[in-house]
Regions:
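Hydrophobic ligand-binding cavity/cleft-lining segments
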Residues: 1-43
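Hydrophobic-ligand-binding modules of eukaryotic lipid transfer/binding families
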Residues: 1-11, 134-141, 153-154
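Short, surface-exposed coil-to-beta transition loops
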Residues: 5-7, 63-67, 87-91
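A short, structured loop/turn motif at beta-sheet edges
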Residues: 16-17, 46-47, 71-76, 93-102, ...
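Hydrophobic pocket/interface hotspot
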Residues: 18-23, 29, 53, 70, ...
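Short, highly charged C-terminal tails/helix-capping segments
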Residues: 41, 142-154
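Short beta-strand segments that buttress and anchor functional surface loops
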Residues: 51-58, 78-85
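Beta-strand/loop substructures that line and gate deep hydrophobic ligand-binding cavities in soluble
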Residues: 82-138, 142, 147
Length: 154
C-alpha cells in the first residue's frame, strides 16, 4: 500500500447482504462520514455499475461537490465507485466472519487524480493531495464506526 491509498476494517454484527444494502445506499453517507454532508443518485439511479451520484462535501474550510460513478456493485461482497471519472477510487468490501461481516473501506488516489489535481490546483496540488490523504486516513475509521453503530441498531 502506498501513501496514496488506505483501508481499514471493522467487524459488524450483521450478515453481508444486510450490510451491503446499507453501504450501497449512498444517500446515507452523510450520516456517517465526517466530511461528506450528503449524496444523491443522479437521474434517479441506484447502486448499479455505471450509475452516477453526486456528493456534497465540507471540510470546515471549503465546500465542494463531486460526481462519482459506481464501478463495482456485487451484493454482499463489494460496492465501489470512482470520483471525477477516475481521480480517486473509494469502496467497501464485505467478508463473512464469525460474529458477522468484516467491512473494509478503501480509498486510493489514481494517476488521473494526481494529474487532475495538478491541473486544478497548480502549485498547490501537492498540498491539496496531502490534505485529502489525511482526510481519508482520519475519516475512514470514523465512517466505519458510524456504519457499525447504525447497522447494529445503536
Amino acid at each position: 500500500m502506498t501513501d496514496l491509498e488506505f483501508s481499514d476494517s471493522v467487524v459488524v454484527d450483521v450478515d453481508p447482504d444486510r450490510l451491503y444494502a446499507l453501504v450501497s445506499d449512498v444517500t446515507r453517507m452523510g450520516e456517517w462520514s465526517p466530511q461528506c454532508r450528503a449524496c444523491w443518485w443522479d437521474e434517479g439511479g441506484g447502486p448499479t455499475v455505471g450509475t452516477y451520484f453526486t456528493g456534497r462535501n465540507d471540510d470546515g474550510k471549503r465546500r465542494w461537490e463531486t460526481r462519482s460513478r459506481v464501478v463495482v456493485a456485487d451484493p454482499g461482497r463489494e460496492f465501489a465507485w470512482v470520483v471525477n471519472d477516475g481521480w480517486v477510487r473509494w469502496g467497501f468490501t464485505l467478508e463473512p466472519v464469525d460474529g458477522g461481516t468484516q467491512l473494509t473501506e478503501s480509498w486510493a488516489f489514481q494517476p488521473e487524480g494526481i494529474q487532475g489535481f495538478h491541473g486544478r490546483f497548480g502549485e498547490h496540488a501537492d498540498e491539496q493531495i496531502v490534505i485529502r490523504t489525511r482526510a481519508a486516513k482520519e475519516g475512514i475509521p470514523i465512517t466505519l464506526a458510524a456504519i457499525k453503530r447504525t447497522a447494529e441498531g445503536g
